[in-house]
UniProtKB/Swiss-Prot annotation:
InterPro entries: DEAD/DEAH_box_helicase_dom, DEAD_box_RNA_helicase, Helicase_ATP-bd, Helicase_C-like, P-loop_NTPase, RNA_helicase_DEAD_Q_motif. Residues 445-492 are annotated as: Disordered. The gene is rhpA. Residues 231-393 form the Helicase C-terminal domain. It comes from the Bacteria. This is DEAD-box ATP-dependent RNA helicase RhpA. GO terms for molecular function: ATP binding; ATP hydrolysis activity; RNA helicase activity; RNA strand annealing activity. Homodimer. Interacts with RNase J (rnj), might be a member of a minimal RNA degradosome complex. CDD domains: DEADc, SF2_C_DEAD.
């Protein structure tokens, strides 16, 4: 049955139209029921523009960042148009195993009332087991390029004529060196297949690929201004290099996030920070590319099921990681580029919920942060790392064990100081040694480099120094209560 929708323009700007509801997009009642049960309220810009185009059978090239609702943008119209003819009707190609599994879960959820059957094909899983699943006549296949190509070359997939082919996170597949595999995969696909290409950026190799495999596509572009989620509060803290782990621990204590992701630059750093947090009794788990498939899946499931509430991850998790309820994202280092920053913070502030994105920077990274802030055209506010609050000190004192050596030291000190004076001095020392990050004078020196002010140091600052109000919109953090182509693809 054809949908009687008005013709679509060949290029769509994300700001061009009013925002409709899902009921306006031409989806079946059974699909809409799953949409609303999944917690969606209204379509995101990419969903608003892509869904009608896909329903009409048009090829689509869409540029939109992670976290904008791309999966539902192609999944919903695909589910809507499935015929249940006992063949693989749609193929989704994606760069990583994690993303493949998440897309499969999303399609299963959105296809609940249409009984959509999926199969997930990726490396690291038994080929024999995958072949058994493929023989059960799934309607949608989600696959990583390498394993899919292996199946095709060895003729393990019979009657493989998908009507729709999706290339998701195309620029990531370029970065991972999969473009030659993609071209070879297209040798096995029918030329009449509808092609949907989604990418966060559009480097030249991706544009050249699109020119080869797409026919008269609808072009959709969701500008960066649509991407910076206003539900995400962005802030940064200036620290010294050696204070990163302690700063994360302090912020976890004072922010008390329900569920958080800490992004690190390296796999080794992810392991080390996870081990540090675990040793301090935080429910932490790690995720990075050196972990085997079983451990990676175990970490993701532990985080999803709240067995762990802190996920320490490299950028392997920043693309496509779709876990609900993430209240905070921490950047252990300033990300290497703006793209990475946007992808990372997109893990929070989803489905209309508020989120917090926190970045740790050193004085040397400050100018780069300002440049990044200008690029994303969004304010990242400067805050000061909070000190230990009174409740924490009382708890620390209450839990502290008194040894014979401490008793002996106490007796010596009370001969020098009055007991009340001794307590005050020890509390002052506790507050001074609990300081993390730069003091007011050091922050001023970064903001006003022309002024002759002392360089940042590790010198401890009395608590009353920190009590002075920040300048220029700063806020004091409140404590909570407790590329080339090997050959041209053939379209046949």
């Amino acid at each position: 049955m054809e949908l009687n929708q008005p013709p679509l323009p060949t290029e769509i700007d994300g700001d061009a139209y009013h925002k409709p509801s899902f009921n306006d997009l031409g989806l079946k009642e059974s699909v809409l029921k799953s949409v609303y049960e999944a917690g969606f309220t209204s379509p995101s810009p990419i969903q608003e523009k892509a869904i009608p185009a896909v329903l009409q059978g048009r090829d689509v090239i869409a540029q939109a960042q992670t976290g904008t609702g791309k999966t539902a943008a192609f999944a919903l119209p695909i589910i809507n148009n499935l015929k249940n003819n006992h063949t693989i009707e749609a193929l989704v190609i994606t760069p990583t195993r994690e993303l493949a599994m998440q897309i499969s879960d999303e399609i299963f959820k959105l296809g609940k009332h249409t009984r959509t059957k999926t199969v997930c094909v990726y490396g690291g899983q038994s080929v024999k087991k995958q072949c058994e699943f493929i023989k059960k006549n799934p309607q949608v296949m989600i696959a990583t390029p390498g394993r899919l190509l292996d199946h095709l070359k060895n003729e393990r997939i019979h009657k493989f004529v998908p009507k729709v082919v999706v290339l998701d996170e195309s620029d990531e597949m370029l970065d991972m060196g999969f473009l030659d595999d993609i071209e070879e995969i297209f040798d096995y696909l029918p030329s009449e297949a509808q092609i949907l290409l989604f990418s966060a950026t559009m480097p030249e190799p991706i544009k050249r690929l699109a020119d080869k495999i797409l026919e008269n596509p609808i072009k959709i572009h969701i500008a960066p201004s649509n991407i910076t989620n206003t539900d995400i509060t962005q802030r940064f803290y200036v620290i010294n290099e050696h204070e990163r782990a302690e700063a994360i621990m302090r912020l976890l204590d004072t922010q008390a996030p329900k569920k958080s992701i800490v992004f690190t630059r390296t796999k080794k750093e992810a392991d080390e920070l996870h081990q540090f947090l675990a040793s301090k009794n935080y429910k932490s788990t790690a995720l990075h590319g050196d972990m085997d498939q079983r451990d990676r899946r175990s970490s993701i499931m532990a985080f999803k099921k709240n067995d762990a509430d802190v996920l320490v991850a490299t950028d392997v998790a920043s693309r496509g990681l779709d876990i609900s309820g993430v209240s905070h994202v921490f950047n252990y280092h300033l990300p290497l580029n703006t793209e990475s920053y946007i992808h990372r913070i997109g893990r929070t502030g989803r489905a209309g919920k508020k989120g917090m994105a926190i970045t740790l920077v050193t004085p040397l990274e400050y100018k780069e942060l300002l440049r990044m802030q200008k690029e994303i055209d969004s304010e990242i506010e400067l805050f000061e790392i909070p000190t230990i609050n009174e409740n924490q000190i009382i708890k620390t004192l209450h839990d502290a064990k008194v040894s014979e050596g401490i008793i002996s030291l106490y007796e010596q000190l009370t001969e020098i100081f009055e007991p009340s004076q001794l307590v005050l001095k020890l509390l002052s020392l506790q507050f001074e040694t609990s300081k993390i990050g730069l003091n007011q004078q050091e922050i001023d020196a970064i903001q006003n480099p022309k002024e002759k002010t002392p360089k940042p140091s590790n010198k401890k600052t009395p608590q009353h120094e920190r009590a002075r109000s920040f300048k220029k919109g700063q806020h004091r953090d409140r404590h909570p209560k407790t590329n080339h182509y090997s050959k041209k693809p053939k379209r046949r």
